[in-house]
Amino acid sequence: MASGKATGKTDAPAPVIKLGGPKPPKVGSSGNASWFQAIKAKKLNSPPLKFEGSGVPDNENLKTSQQHGYWRRQARFKPSKGGRKPVPDAWYFYYTGTGPAADLNWGDSQDGIVWVAAKGADTKSRSNQGTRDPDKFDQYPLRFSDGGPDGNFRWDFIPLNRGRSGKSTAASSAASSRAPSREGSRGRRSGAEDDLIARAAKIIQDQQKKGARITKAKADEMAHRRYCKRTIPPGYKVDQVFGPRTKGKEGNFGDDKMNEEGIKDGRVTAMLNLVPSSHACLFGSRVTPKLQPDGLHLKFEFTTVVSRNDPQFDNYVKICDQCVDGVGTRPKDDEPKPKSRSSSRPATRTSSPAPRQPRPKKEKKTKKQDDEVDKALTSDEERNNAQLEFDDEPKVINWGDSALGENEL
């Protein structure tokens, strides 16, 4: 069985699987990796994997009788000075009769193996699904229609429409399919206010991926419809749609960074959480009509109150301080910094799913140090770790108690 590397490949045409589309995997391959992404333990020495439902990942290409298999624990190690450091385990799913435990029958007891089966599955049968060749196919995103793992585990959220050329961001999933995403630690800025902005940006990116692609004509229509109904299309600046930013009068929200980035600036979506809906604006505002030579002017005065007990109160205050009458200014953390030896390197780590490689060691080593280096990762461990992020437990923000509720965005 091939290991998923260059060795073991043949000239036979690769099976065609659209892992970037909405369909789950249909056929096997010559590799020995799981078709699905890993579930990760939140802590070292975590309890055995348990599920709210059956524990079988959704795969509509299989009959109910074939929906059974096992989760296999994979120890993970992070390269560190003088050797390696253990990190929380990962668990991979394989169908019965495939993968590293292909010789086991369903239910056979073995350390690090958890057997799962959907209701109505024929656990006496063996699967012909095969396994994945990592050189040819991406991991397929995990989805559990009847409930995911318990609170001791999580997985990285990967959109179903991700293409092979676009590696997913490590947006950590909650421990259930009913709470699908929150920001991961790769590329995450410190502080609760940055988590708010990062989550807001993630929300709008996911909404754009789910919706239809916006054409140039559609974007132009969005930016030039009646002023009160305009929305900022992707790639547009704020002043292209709503005019130059000002101070002390209408159009005074937005600093230079927000104006340049438009809806890519996560603070936009964060503040939309406080903006009234059309109905709230009409029926909850003080409406003042005034006849002018050019027509009827309608003024809507609406007040949104953010409680000081709101978990995001300080974040909203910070954004308002930056953006109200913010023309000509930028956030302090966005100001250019002097180039240094480390900051002058290309910032590619946030887009890479691979673990950080250890720096080359200097030539001068003692014999003891040489022995410690020999205890570093084995080739098998490196291959397994190549699929994983060594990320910390994401910070949790209580969005349920925030200003207008978790469903307002």
Swiss-Prot record:
SUPFAM superfamilies: Coronavirus RNA-binding domain, Nucleocapsid protein dimerization domain. This is Nucleoprotein. Residues 31-156 form the CoV N NTD domain. The gene is N. One of its GO terms (cellular component) is host cell Golgi apparatus. Residues 226-333 are annotated as: Dimerization. It is found in: Virion; Host endoplasmic reticulum-Golgi intermediate compartment; Host Golgi apparatus. Disulfide bonds join 320-323.
